[in-house]
Design a protein with these regions (language model features):
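Conserved PLP-enzyme active-site core in the AAT-like
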Residues: 4-9, 31, 67-70, 80-300
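Short, glycine-/Ser/Thr-/acidic-enriched flexible segments
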Residues: 26, 161, 216-217, 232-234, ...
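Conserved N-terminal alpha-helix of the aminotransferase class I/II PLP-enzyme fold
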Residues: 36-79
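Short, compositionally biased
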Residues: 116, 121, 454-465
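Conserved C-terminal alpha-helix-loop-beta "cap" of PLP-dependent enzymes
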Residues: 283-461
């Protein structure tokens, strides 16, 4: 088949002159930066159109579907965000009800707002000492579906940001008994298909729609993702329609070529690449497991949290029981060793290993963690913070749409207790809300936000970037805020 990235390379070297978008006209001299302008084109003859793919882009998407063993694959240049928005919109009628895992990405909540959906939350298990969310159990999904017969779809995240995988096969069987589709946000699992060292992809276990971010764990550029249709329960026409709505009408050919090149490379060299990657990764993990204070988290440490499988490419370093926290570990790795981690949390720091990593890179990380481990002190259990980022069962008093569209008033965090939030607040990354518009603000929420800020963690979503105030929703016809008597 003709490869998009090769055709783009060839075209970039040609003498065709562009009297069309984009404005740089494939001329490097037009910019102060050295970008790949010669390959940045629009929908010109021979290069197809992502929103009406009939040629080279159709072939590229079909090739990706063949590699992953799915019925149909849609490229997304707006990341997994656009794919999640499209999946939810195509699966649930406007104003309908959906069962979602509470630890879903903020894009899912944005879909709830845009489609005025009514969420039913299923909560993950959690390890409170380590501060890590576990999996979603099929039993919980079954219970919520029995209690909410009008649910039109189920959406869960697996693997989580931390690498926790739920039992997708069993969950899919439960969901299908109720005659509805299962959507799996597998943004962090695009690499599963390429090595038995990793868990099995949801696309092979009965999920109906699977979303993957190529850019997270495969050699592809930022913003590149795919939506896989895996069963006949999915209305492909609706998926196509909503992908066209939520994606830009000017998709980047550089990004699409990046996805095509990624698939081509893995088809040709993937087995050898992943063989070397998993060898170096496992060697590093065995070395890191010898540290005595900074603990590399393994699946065996998360038993009892609903975990079914674990993605070992996620390098979680627990600081529980030590004199430092996750933020401090993150800062030490960055400032002293010039190692940038993916995320920091209260009690751990997270690094993502991927097929592009080198043996030298793993060695640098191991050496840095060993050095920090040697100088870190253990502290008595009684001195450990007992607070954790728990997904507390928040009381929903308004729908997300009602709260976000209502008249709003700003209060200090302490004054807002008992009122209805009109804003999201979440730790980013990973972008999982700790409060959702329409939910009642509690004292625990306020204490959590204060604690996160004190520890240097990044609280986003609030319009007040200092996180000192929050917008609340008016709840009566006059538009004035009604104080709720419930306080903590």
């Amino acid at each position: 088949m003709e490869r998009l990235y090769k055709k783009l390379e060839s075209y970039g070297k040609s003498d065709y002159y562009p009297f069309h978008m984009p404005g740089h006209k494939r001329n490097k001299a037009s910019s102060a930066g050295d970008f790949a302008f010669e390959r940045d084109i629009t929908e010109i003859s021979g290069f197809d159109n992502l929103h009406h793919a009939e040629g080279i882009l159709k072939e590229a998407q079909e090739n990706a579907a063949q590699i992953y063993g799915t019925k149909k694959c849609f490229f997304s240049v707006n990341g997994s965000t656009a794919a999640l928005l499209a999946a939810v919109s195509a699966s649930v009628s406007k104003g309908g009800r959906i069962l979602v895992a509470r630890n879903c990405h903020k894009a899912v909540y944005h879909a709830l707002y845009l489609r005025d959906l009514l969420p039913v939350y299923v909560y993950p298990h959690e390890d409170k000492r380590l501060g890590i969310n576990g999996g979603i159990s099929a039993r919980s999904v079954e219970r919520y579906l029995e209690e909410n017969q009008d649910v039109q779809a189920v959406l869960i995240t697996s693997p989580t940001y931390d690498g926790v995988v739920s039992d997708i096969k069993e969950i899919a069987e439960v969901v299908h008994r109720h005659g509805i589709p299962l959507i799996v946000d597998e943004a962090h699992g695009a690499h599963f298909r390429f090595s038995d060292y990793f868990p099995v992809s949801a696309a092979e276990l009965g999920a109906d729609i699977v979303i993957q971010s190529f850019h997270k764990t495969l050699p592809s550029m930022t913003q590149t993702a795919v939506l896989h249709v895996c069963s006949d329960m999915v209305d492909v026409g609706k998926i196509k329609r909503f992908m066209g709505i939520y994606q830009t009408s000017s998709p980047s050919y550089i990004l699409m070529a990046s996805m095509d090149a990624c698939m081509d490379k893995l088809q040709k060299d993937g087995k050898q690449m992943f063989r070397e990657f998993t060898y170096n990764l496992e060697k590093a993990r065995q070395r890191l497991l010898k540290c005595e204070k900074i603990k590399l988290i393994e699946a065996s440490m998360l038993q009892g949290t609903g975990i079914y499988d674990f993605d070992r490419s996620k390098l979680l370093f627990s600081t529980v029981g030590t004199s430092i926290n996750g933020h401090q570990l993150h800062e030490m790795l960055r400032d002293r060793y010039h190692i940038e981690m993916e995320m920091e949390a209260e009690k751990y720091a997270l690094g993502i290993a991927a097929v592009g990593d080198t043996e030298e890179g793993f060695d640098r990380l191991c050496t840095a963690i060993e050095d920090i481990d040697a100088e870190t002190e253990l502290i008595p259990a009684a001195e450990e913070s007992q607070e954790n980022n728990s997904h507390a069962r928040m009381k929903q008093l308004m729908t997300i749409s009602q709260a976000m569209d209502a008249q709003q008033r700003r209060y200090s965090l302490e004054e807002s207790i008992g009122k209805v939030s009109a804003e999201f607040a979440y730790l980013y990354p990973p972008g999982i809300p700790i409060i959702v518009p329409g939910e009642q603000i509690t004292g625990q929420f306020v204490r959590n936000v204060r604690r996160y800020m004190e520890q240097g963690l990044e609280v986003q979503g609030l319009s007040d970037t200092s996180a000192e105030t929050i917008c609340v929703a008016a709840r009566n016809e006059s538009g004035q805020e009604e104080d709720s008597p419930a306080k903590e």
